[in-house]
UniProtKB/Swiss-Prot annotation:
Homotetramer; dimer of dimers. Keywords: Amino-acid biosynthesis, Cytoplasm, Diaminopimelate biosynthesis, Lyase, Lysine biosynthesis, Schiff base. It is found in: Cytoplasm. The active site is at residues 144, 172. Coiled coil: none annotated. One of its GO terms (biological process) is diaminopimelate biosynthetic process. This is 4-hydroxy-tetrahydrodipicolinate synthase. Its EC number is 4.3.3.7. It is an enzyme of class 4 (lyase). PANTHER family: 4-HYDROXY-2-OXOGLUTARATE ALDOLASE, MITOCHONDRIAL, DIHYDRODIPICOLINATE SYNTHASE. GO terms for cellular component: cytosol.
Length: 302
């Protein structure tokens, strides 16, 4: 009997960028800049984009702003690029409504985070995601587990019970461990496409069955992120490891404080005036900004 494992599909490609939300000088969403940035990210190697997720500051965006942002990005990149909308909420009715609206607005999928703050039990999580899946059966869903932010973690057995929902096709693993990927594959099989939610864990997660990454660093090093993933998948682990080790300083700098504070500063330093995060997040402090600038300079070709 061959020990070869079945590989998962890639419903949204290998490299997705979790987009920042640009704000203008008055703090309003800059839709024109969002469109230009989206196009740039695709040109730099992203297969698809996620709008209104954690990096996109969804907690401080109104539903109207999120809808406008999805429309602007969708128009900017055209029909050939998957665009996922963050539609999660800790209220099931709100998440259902947002997911239906995203489907109607032309999203190619929805990123749906586990409910935060109210800490539902596993049975509540199952009911929550089942209601969302049934409300928009034509829209592929990516479940999103990030317990460090939400206060609850979705167990692999719970995800496995949801595999009868045909539109639950993928999972963003952001618990900070490779064990989550293994446990999900053992519980759900190869049907579920697992994406790393941590830039620094992409390479080890690929080795245990993840199919790609929802990346923050790809705002700045999209081609290198893509090269790392492709090198590993094409049987060049040493090349992939070389990319990984070169990028570790950037990965650390981008998560030296709360995301997306550093990546917005990095984009500003790179000529993209995306503005500061909305309160209660703050701009990156001067010392960290100087260190980030040095990290970016070290990555530039000489």
């Amino acid at each position: 009997m061959s020990p070869a494992a079945e590989l998962s599909p890639t419903p949204f490609g290998r490299l997705l960028t979790a987009m920042v939300t640009p704000f203008d000088a008055e703090g309003a969403v800059d839709l024109a800049l969002a469109g230009r940035l989206a196009r740039h990210l695709v040109d730099e190697g992203s297969d698809g984009l996620v709008v209104c997720g954690t990096t996109g500051e969804s907690p401080t965006l109104s539903w109207d702003e999120q809808s406008q942002l999805l429309e602007a990005v969708r128009q900017a990149v055209g029909p050939g690029v998957p665009v996922l909308a963050g539609t999660g909420s800790n209220c099931t009715q709100e998440a259902v409504k947002a997911t239906r609206e995203a489907a109607a607005a032309g999203a190619d999928g929805a990123l749906v985070v586990t409910p935060y703050y109210n800490k539902p039990p596993q049975e509540g999580l199952e009911a929550h995601f089942r209601a969302i899946a049934e409300a928009a059966p034509e829209l592929p869903l990516m479940l999103y587990n990030i317990p460090g932010r939400t206060g609850c973690s979705m167990e692999p057995a719970t995800v496995a019970r949801l595999m009868d929902c045909s539109n639950i096709v993928s999972f963003k693993a952001a618990s900070g461990t490779t064990e989550e990927v293994t446990a999900l594959r053992l519980a759900c099989g190869a049907k579920l496409a697992i994406y790393s939610g941590d830039d620094g864990l992409v390479l080890p997660m690929l080795s245990v069955g993840a199919v790609g990454v929802v990346s923050v660093a790809s705002h700045l090093v999209g081609r290198r992120m893509r090269a790392m993933v492709e090198a590993y998948l094409s049987g060049q682990p040493a090349v992939a490891l070389g990319h990984h080790e070169q990028l570790i300083p950037l990965f650390k700098a981008l998560f030296a404080t709360t995301n997306p504070i550093p990546v917005k500063a990095a984009l500003e330093l790179s000529g993209w005036p995306v503005g500061s995060p909305r309160s209660p997040l703050l701009p990156l402090d001067p010392a960290m900004r100087a260190a980030l600038s040095d990290t970016l300079a070290a990555l530039r070709p000489t």
